[in-house]
């Protein structure tokens, strides 16, 4: 019996892309894997256990060791700054963090208000720009904030830009590109380095193959 590897996976769009990547890497996941409503899924034939978590919680699970490895967006890693190893850029779930707001708006006022799910990232970015701002943390529907006068600008994830467009907002600043990463708990890596290295290697081959296309 090999070592059981527990992997934290984000629910939603990243989960489906990550599951596809694991299958390409040769891991035999059950057909109903993506459709399961379970939060813990065991795949005994691969010595794998999956914990399905909210995207913002994956790094927490890995840092605390309840998951040995995980797949997390770079946005979450920048925001949470957890003590985990970032082993591999999986090059999936591509998007970027951006500043956006209503067009033709004067933003020269004192301490503009910024609404975001990423208060740490936003604070750091505007500090680097030498701009003093007031951060308002929201948990969803960030695009609503400028429309109702809650904030002057927003910092949020942009994929296609369609959501911004539909709400009459325009992107004004590109903060950084985002992809999903394969992350590892430092203690788990010492105890299970063989199986973790194997998974990283198999995933890396798939990523390199996709990038070369």
From Swiss-Prot:
GO molecular function, one term: ATP binding
Predominant location: cytoplasm
Cellular component GO terms held in the UniProt record: cytoplasm
Entry EC no(s): 2.4.2.17
Keyword Hydrolase appears in the UniProt entry: no
Alphabetized PANTHER family for the sequence: ATP PHOSPHORIBOSYLTRANSFERASE, ATP PHOSPHORIBOSYLTRANSFERASE ATP-PRTASE
Domain comment as written in the entry: Lacks the C-terminal regulatory region which is replaced by HisZ.
Protein name, per record: ATP phosphoribosyltransferase
Encoding gene (name): hisG
């Amino acid at each position: 019996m090999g070592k059981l590897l527990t992997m934290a996976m984000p629910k939603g769009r990243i989960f489906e892309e990550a599951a596809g990547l694991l299958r390409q890497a040769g891991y035999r996941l059950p057909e109903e894997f993506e459709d399961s409503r379970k939060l813990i899924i065991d795949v005994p034939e691969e010595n794998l256990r999956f914990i399905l978590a909210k995207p913002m919680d994956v790094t927490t699970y890995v840092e605390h060791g309840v998951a040995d490895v995980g797949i997390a967006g770079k946005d979450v890693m920048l925001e949470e700054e957890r003590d985990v190893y970032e082993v591999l850029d999986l090059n999936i779930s591509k998007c970027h963090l951006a500043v956006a707001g209503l067009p033709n708006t004067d933003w020269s006022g004192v301490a503009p208000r910024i609404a975001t799910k990423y208060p740490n990232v936003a604070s750091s970015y505007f500090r680097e720009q030498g701009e003093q701002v007031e951060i308002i943390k929201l948990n969803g529907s960030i695009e609503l904030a400028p429309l109702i006068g809650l904030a002057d600008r927003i910092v949020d994830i942009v994929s296609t830009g369609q959501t911004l467009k539909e709400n009459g907002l325009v992107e004004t600043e590109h903060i950084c590109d985002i992809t999903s990463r394969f992350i590892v708990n430092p203690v788990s890596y010492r105890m299970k380095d063989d199986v973790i290295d194997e998974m990283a290697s198999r995933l890396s081959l798939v990523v390199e193959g996709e990038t070369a296309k």
